[in-house]
Amino acid sequence: MALELSTAGIKVKWAVETTAQTRPTTGFSTLRGVKSIPEFNPEPSTLEVTDLSDEEWKRYIAGLKDPGGAIGLTVNDFADFRADWTSLMEAYETASADGKQLWIEYAIPGMDSYYYPAIPSALGFGGAEVDAVLENVAYLTPNGAPVWATASA
């Protein structure tokens, strides 16, 4: 019997395509300081296909899936994170100019990784409170279908 997994040790990583339209499998860098990853499990829309021959129940088929917009990663806003995000943004800009995408990996110990192509947004100011850790939200807009696959090397 398999044991349930803990979220301890999950890493958010990124890499750009070396070949356009091909998910990278190596060369991923870790984004330090990530505290929280939101749900990314979009439900499909439902399309009604009921016709006049149906006498009691409506019928539906699955439509498109919508991730609902940008994915917000809650992060500790410190120098190492800012350096990582700057590197990610610069790599994205360079790759984008060459027709290539940035890929995000959620590396989960004990199972396959979750990957998706994304467009990052520039950081703003995440706010502040008395006696609290300085945090921010780093936004990644999904730009393609996610996939479960073997963890990157």
Q: What are these regions, as identified by a protein language model?
A:
Residues M1-T7, W148-A153:
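Compositionally biased, intrinsically disordered low-complexity segments enriched in polar/Pro/Gly
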Residues A2-D77, I119-L134:
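Solvent-exposed edge beta-strands and adjacent loop segments
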Residues E17-Q21, M111, T150-S152:
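Polar, enzyme-active/binding microenvironments
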Residues P24-T25, D84-W85, A151:
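A short, polar/proline- and glycine-enriched secondary-structure boundary/capping micro-motif
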Residues D77-F81, A145:
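Acidic glycine-/aspartate-rich tracts in secreted/extracellular proteins
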Residues R82-P117, S121:
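Short, acidic/charged, Gly/Pro-enriched secondary-structure junctions
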Residues S87-Y92, E135-V137, S152-A153:
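Short intrinsically disordered coil segments
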Residues E105-W148:
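Short beta-strand and beta-hairpin "edge-sheet" elements
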